[in-house]
């Protein structure tokens, strides 16, 4: 590269970053690709917004049944731009689910799930399940009346499963009833377990797309 900087030359010598950039920028894009093929990328952007705003809220949120609601109120009323951070988090969550649904429909209607892209489809469906689980766990964190009863209903659903139903309910709730252990588990799932799971499946998903390319037209 002409007129390159010393910093660029230092990285180029060690990592060959120009070859990486050329490989990314020269990937063939089929002529049938249109704006609807951007829905997956928009979903990723929504996830990144979720991650950033969620991380910011962890500085103020207190995952206890006694202080969860008041900490959310403090974030909304006393923290500078706290209302904006939480509002962006909520709206981007809704947008992420909407974009995900549209993306799934686009892939299905254009046959993007067919051989040899079955595993790409499986990882995508897995991410869809994780995304919905994000909504269920996040809904409970303010620990208001809506959140409490939502957790009570959702965590009680597995009771209908034969043999292991009661065990699954107790596992979700952290005991026989909804309480502090339930909130702690949902907070852990929402802020640590699920983000890592989603990141891993996203990486697998993108690597498969990178390897196999975009599916052709119907």
From Swiss-Prot:
<dbReference type="GO" id="GO:0045158">
    <property type="term" value="F:electron transporter, transferring electrons within cytochrome b6/f complex of photosystem II activity"/>
</dbReference>
<feature type="transmembrane region" description="Helical">
    <location>
        <begin position="189"/>
        <end position="209"/>
    </location>
</feature>
<keyword id="KW-0408">Iron</keyword>
<keyword id="KW-1133">Transmembrane helix</keyword>
<dbReference type="GO" id="GO:0046872">
    <property type="term" value="F:metal ion binding"/>
</dbReference>
<dbReference type="InterPro" id="IPR023530">
    <property type="entry name" value="Cyt_B6_PetB"/>
</dbReference>
<feature type="transmembrane region" description="Helical">
    <location>
        <begin position="119"/>
        <end position="139"/>
    </location>
</feature>
<keyword id="KW-0249">Electron transport</keyword>
<comment type="similarity">
    <text>Belongs to the cytochrome b family. PetB subfamily.</text>
</comment>
<dbReference type="InterPro" id="IPR048259">
    <property type="entry name" value="Cytochrome_b_N_euk/bac"/>
</dbReference>
<dbReference type="InterPro" id="IPR016174">
    <property type="entry name" value="Di-haem_cyt_TM"/>
</dbReference>
<dbReference type="GO" id="GO:0015979">
    <property type="term" value="P:photosynthesis"/>
</dbReference>
<feature type="transmembrane region" description="Helical">
    <location>
        <begin position="35"/>
        <end position="55"/>
    </location>
</feature>
<feature type="binding site" description="axial binding residue">
    <location>
        <position position="190"/>
    </location>
    <ligand>
        <name>heme b 2</name>
    </ligand>
</feature>
<keyword id="KW-0349">Heme</keyword>
<dbReference type="GO" id="GO:0016491">
    <property type="term" value="F:oxidoreductase activity"/>
</dbReference>
<comment type="subunit">
    <text>The 4 large subunits of the cytochrome b6-f complex are cytochrome b6, subunit IV (17 kDa polypeptide, PetD), cytochrome f and the Rieske protein, while the 4 small subunits are PetG, PetL, PetM and PetN. The complex functions as a dimer.</text>
</comment>
<protein>
    <recommendedName>
        <fullName>Cytochrome b6</fullName>
    </recommendedName>
</protein>
<dbReference type="InterPro" id="IPR005797">
    <property type="entry name" value="Cyt_b/b6_N"/>
</dbReference>
<feature type="binding site" description="axial binding residue">
    <location>
        <position position="89"/>
    </location>
    <ligand>
        <name>heme b 2</name>
    </ligand>
</feature>
<keyword id="KW-0813">Transport</keyword>
<keyword id="KW-0812">Transmembrane</keyword>
<dbReference type="GO" id="GO:0031676">
    <property type="term" value="C:plasma membrane-derived thylakoid membrane"/>
</dbReference>
<dbReference type="Pfam" id="PF00033">
    <property type="entry name" value="Cytochrome_B"/>
</dbReference>
<dbReference type="GO" id="GO:0022904">
    <property type="term" value="P:respiratory electron transport chain"/>
</dbReference>
<feature type="transmembrane region" description="Helical">
    <location>
        <begin position="93"/>
        <end position="113"/>
    </location>
</feature>
<feature type="binding site" description="covalent">
    <location>
        <position position="38"/>
    </location>
    <ligand>
        <name>heme c</name>
    </ligand>
</feature>
<comment type="function">
    <text>Component of the cytochrome b6-f complex, which mediates electron transfer between photosystem II (PSII) and photosystem I (PSI), cyclic electron flow around PSI, and state transitions.</text>
</comment>
<feature type="binding site" description="axial binding residue">
    <location>
        <position position="205"/>
    </location>
    <ligand>
        <name>heme b 1</name>
    </ligand>
</feature>
<dbReference type="InterPro" id="IPR027387">
    <property type="entry name" value="Cytb/b6-like_sf"/>
</dbReference>
<keyword id="KW-0793">Thylakoid</keyword>
<keyword id="KW-0472">Membrane</keyword>
<feature type="binding site" description="axial binding residue">
    <location>
        <position position="103"/>
    </location>
    <ligand>
        <name>heme b 1</name>
    </ligand>
</feature>
<keyword id="KW-0479">Metal-binding</keyword>
<keyword id="KW-0602">Photosynthesis</keyword>
């Amino acid at each position: 590269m002409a007129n390159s900087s010393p910093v660029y030359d230092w990285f180029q010598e060690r990592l060959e970053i120009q070859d990486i950039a050329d490989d990314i920028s020269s990937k063939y894009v089929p002529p049938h690709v249109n704006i609807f093929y951007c829905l997956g990328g928009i979903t990723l952007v929504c996830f990144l917004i979720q991650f950033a705003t969620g991380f910011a809220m962890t500085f103020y949120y207190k995952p206890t049944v006694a202080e969860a609601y008041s900490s959310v109120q403090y974030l909304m009323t006393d923290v500078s731009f706290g209302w904006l951070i939480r509002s962006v988090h909520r709206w981007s969550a809704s947008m992420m689910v909407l974009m995900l649904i549209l993306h799934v429909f686009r892939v299905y209607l254009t046959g993007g799930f067919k051989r040899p892209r079955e595993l790409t489809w499986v990882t995508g469906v897995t991410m869809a399940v994780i995304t919905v689980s994000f909504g269920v766990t996040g809904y409970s964190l303010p620990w208001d009346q809506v959140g409490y009863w939502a957790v009570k209903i959702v965590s009680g659903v597995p009771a209908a499963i034969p043999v292991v139903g009661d065990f699954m309910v107790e596992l979700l709730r952290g005991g026989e009833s909804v309480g502090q252990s339930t909130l702690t588990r949902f907070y852990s799932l929402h802020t640590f377990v699920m983000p890592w799971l989603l990141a891993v499946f996203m990486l697998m998903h993108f690597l498969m797309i990178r390897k196999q390319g975009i599916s052709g037209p119907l």
